[in-house]
């Protein structure tokens, strides 16, 4: 069992006349056996995004961390209830006093989880609990910069005594479906994109050589996982550093009814695969790959159109999300862009935390000066 090397229980009290304003905070060093109220809080959060759910976090903790990386779960609750008011899944490296949210390169969105209608007090108590454990720094990313929780988190960190700095992570392309059919959506794409898709579909499906398959669960699931793994290893992408994570995610999604795994077969061989996750009205385009030997077939384009039709006309999702990055092809398919940001916070009660904040402040102050100097140098 993974474990944090620090106290697992502590009390955090805000003194006042009303005992309901007293908070108790704790750190659970394992995500594998959570009490039902904790599981319920995480799964309620997962309705907004499946990456906030207990299943996602448990798969990440179990199958996507190095041996020296240790997960945990902070919580705070009011003294008069056993129900958690706020939760923070966390991660740190053995021997380090730098803490971060439980997110990795597999994560497209992270959040502190708050169960109270007025989140500010619960978040401040949560971050006070973390700070009093003596961590030098706390990094939270990627966060939804356009959501209320982002500003609430920044404010709560300050109230809890942290020195907090926001930073940009990446762009995120998405599209509100707005009740359209696939035909209406497709007609709204650029004419060049529409013509390309039609031409490539015709070529791929000609003479019955190309076939498209959708796997959601059932007897084809394990064979589909094997096909995904083989295609990914034959693609241009780097090998998976944690080979158990994707099979674990696929099985989790199949169990929950979230999986939309598309396979493109040509002459009986699987040549392209895409993993889409459909949960609570949202379709996330999570992973895609194709066998480079079959690149001229453009099977990935054909498969994207196939899955777009599925999630719009069959699943009736409200939003489609490309998750991470500003790859040029994403704006061919989806219309809107937003940004994901992070927050880097330092604990001024520790020497290392204070030094980190000083360096952060100095770097931010120097950045515009350096930009102006480079601009002048370029004109010289």
Which residues are covered by each model-predicted region?
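Intrinsically disordered, low-complexity proline-rich regions
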Residues: 5-6, 12-15, 89, 106, ...
């Amino acid at each position: 069992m993974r474990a944090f090397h620090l106290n697992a229980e502590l009390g955090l009290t805000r003194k006042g006349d009303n005992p309901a304003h007293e908070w108790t905070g704790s750190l659970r060093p394992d995500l594998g056996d959570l009490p039902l109220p904790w599981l319920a809080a995480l799964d309620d959060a997962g309705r907004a995004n499946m990456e906030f759910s207990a299943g996602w976090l448990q798969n990440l903790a179990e199958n996507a961390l190095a041996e020296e990386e240790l997960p945990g779960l902070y919580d705070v609750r009011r003294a008069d209830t056993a129900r958690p008011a706020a939760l923070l899944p966390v991660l740190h490296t053995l021997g380090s006093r730098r803490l971060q949210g439980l997110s990795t390169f597999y994560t497209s969105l992270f959040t502190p989880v708050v169960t109270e209608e007025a989140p500010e007090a619960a978040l401040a108590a949560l971050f006070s609990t973390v700070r009093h454990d003596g961590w030098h720094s706390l990094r939270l990313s990627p966060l939804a910069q356009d959501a209320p929780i982002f500003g609430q988190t920044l404010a709560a960190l300050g109230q809890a005594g942290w020195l907090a700095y926001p930073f940009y992570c990446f762009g995120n392309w998405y599209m509100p479906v707005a009740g359209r059919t696939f035909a209406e959506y497709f007609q709204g794409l650029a004419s060049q994109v529409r013509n390309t898709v039609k031409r490539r579909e015709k070529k791929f499906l000609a003479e019955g050589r190309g076939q498209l398959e959708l796997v959601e669960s059932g007897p084809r699931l394990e064979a589909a996982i094997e096909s995904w793994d083989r295609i990914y290893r034959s693609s241009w992408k780097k090998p998976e550093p944690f080979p158990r994570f994707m099979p674990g995610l696929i099985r989790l999604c199949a169990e929950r009814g979230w999986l939309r795994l598309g396979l493109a077969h040509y002459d009986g061989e699987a040549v392209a695969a895409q993993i889409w996750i459909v949960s609570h009205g949202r379709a996330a385009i999570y992973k895609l790959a194709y066998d480079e030997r079959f690149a001229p077939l453009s099977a990935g384009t054909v498969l994207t159109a196939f899955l777009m039709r599925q999630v719009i006309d069959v699943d009736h999702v409200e939003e489609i999300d490309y998750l991470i990055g500003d790859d040029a092809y994403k704006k061919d398919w989806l219309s809107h862009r937003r940004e994901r940001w992070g927050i880097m916070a330092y604990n001024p009660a520790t020497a290392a935390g204070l030094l980190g904040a000083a360096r952060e402040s100095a770097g931010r102050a120097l950045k515009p000066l350096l930009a102006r100097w480079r601009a002048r140098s370029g004109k010289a």
